[in-house]
Amino acid sequence: LELGVDVFLLQADLLNDNETLSLFDKCKKLIKRPVNLLINNASIFEYDNIKTATLESWSRHQKSNLQVPFFLTQKFAEQAPEPDKLENGELESRSCIINIIDQRVQNLTTDFTTYTLAKSALWTLTRISAKALAPKIRVNAVGPGPTLKAEFQSISNYKKQRLSTPLQRGSSTSEICETIKYLSL
């Protein structure tokens, strides 16, 4: 498929601080210009609840779902270009961060407690970053509902979960991609 764009694949263990923090340096070497889009989507999603959560489950969820996006946001902001000035004097950002949160931040349950706490904090980080980094960087979040059946989830539970949303349906991956595409323009 020929789209007329260059694509570079980078891999890092995001639970490893050195690998995480070196991503932008590796990326800048490859593309030879500032990175203009950051999508914080990497995530750990493991079951626990208030009774079964451990220090390890807490740490893994906080690190992958909050700490890594926070420091990637910092690195992104350091290298993002200044916004363009339009003819009418208004500014237009050339950089965008999109955090993938979860519908659970608005639709709380007693399951996946440490995951939900971390994603809720990522939603807060999104709002703080949007204010702190404007007008240089636009920061948004997408909080999809049930999209893919979890490995451990029964089909009937998955269908029930999709029907429990306000629209009584889940999200499709193509809808999420179209939303991200729109927000990143």
PLM features: residue spans?
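Conserved SDR Rossmann-fold cofactor-binding beta-strand/turn motif
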Residues: R138-L148
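Substrate-binding pocket helix/loop in short-chain dehydrogenase/reductase
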Residues: N49-I50, T54-Q62, Q161
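Conserved NAD(P)H cofactor-binding loop of Rossmann-fold oxidoreductase domains
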Residues: N41-E46
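A short, exposed helix-loop element centered on a Lys and neighboring polar residues
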Residues: T73-Q74, R127
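Catalytic loop of short-chain dehydrogenase/reductase
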Residues: K85-A134, P146
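The beta1-alpha1 cofactor-binding region of Rossmann-like NAD(H)/NADP(H)-dependent oxidoreductases
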Residues: Q11-S22, L55, S174
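C-terminal helical subdomain
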Residues: A141, K160-L185
